[in-house]
Amino acid sequence: MRQSGASQPLLINMYLPDPVGDGLFKDGKNPSWGPLSPAVQKGSGQIQLWQFLLELLADRANAGCIAWEGGHGEFKLTDPDEVARRWGERKSKPNMNYDKLSRALRYYYDKNIMSKVHGKRYAYRFDFQGLAQACQPPPAHAHAAAAAAAAAAAAQDGALYKLPAGLAPLPFPGLSKLNLMAASAGVAPAGFSYWPGPGPAATAAAATAALYPSPSLQPPPGPFGAVAAASHLGGHYH
């Protein structure tokens, strides 16, 4: 014998806009559960299929296409084509039919939200306990852990794939020798590395300074270097 919607668990009131239809399930609402967000209020396209079905079931005027039957969350699509048409209208999908709608309903089987009533055509049953668990928001510590993991991943990605600001790859292979010479002089190497340091010109100058620490020991350029050196040494004997 078909039972009225009022005999269904009062848990349904969690998932329905307030007020709905003729006010079914209004009394006895669990205060720890809130109503649907404004985005899924009655008439909105931002609504899931299970919410849409509960919305239809809450209004006795829809008994011609869907109605509670048998208790314990069981309901029947008395006119499955009409239910599919209304669902397609709500979601702006004019090609919606019962075959597509039934495939969408099967998605809820693995989620423990709904099941098919065996031996009855177009009959389904809501699992309100599973539905309540599926709708529970994750705990606060889960949000914090997810944020920390995202920050760590972003930091690791930056360390592996990004060069520090102001550094550039080596312009030519010979500069690596200058980097080694500069390192022996206590100058941080530059170029293709993660160590901040002077540019290539400064590095070359530092390497030259390491080889010739005193300006007086710098060799003059060109072939006159030997003559200049001889005259410089000869000055000490006068």
Curated annotation (Swiss-Prot):
DNA-binding interval(s): 47-127
Compartment(s) where it occurs, according to its Swiss-Prot or TrEMBL record: Nucleus
InterPro entries the record matches: Ets_dom, ETS_fam, WH-like_DNA-bd_sf, WH_DNA-bd_sf
Molecular function via GO: DNA-binding transcription activator activity, RNA polymerase II-specific; DNA-binding transcription factor activity, RNA polymerase II-specific; RNA polymerase II cis-regulatory region sequence-specific DNA binding; sequence-specific double-stranded DNA binding
SMART domains: ETS (SM00413)
Tissue expression pattern: In brain, exclusively expressed in the major serotonergic neurons of the dorsal and median raphe nuclei located in the midbrain and pons. Also detected in prostate and small intestine.
GO biological process, one term: neuron maturation
Organism superkingdom: Eukaryota
Keywords per UniProt: Chromosomal rearrangement, Developmental protein, Differentiation, DNA-binding, Neurogenesis, Nucleus, Transcription, Transcription regulation
Renumbered residue ranges of the record's region May mediate active transcriptional repression: 129-238
One GO cellular component, as annotated: nucleus
Site feature Breakpoint for insertion to form EWS-FEV fusion protein, where: D18, P19
Family from the record: Belongs to the ETS family.
Role of this protein: Functions as a transcriptional regulator. According to PubMed:12761502, it functions as a transcriptional repressor. Functions in the differentiation and the maintenance of the central serotonergic neurons. May play a role in cell growth.
Disease: Sudden infant death syndrome: SIDS is the sudden death of an infant younger than 1 year that remains unexplained after a thorough case investigation, including performance of a complete autopsy, examination of the death scene, and review of clinical history. Pathophysiologic mechanisms for SIDS may include respiratory dysfunction, cardiac dysrhythmias, cardiorespiratory instability, and inborn errors of metabolism, but definitive pathogenic mechanisms precipitating an infant sudden death remain elusive.
Name used for this protein in its record: Protein FEV
Gene this protein is translated from: FEV
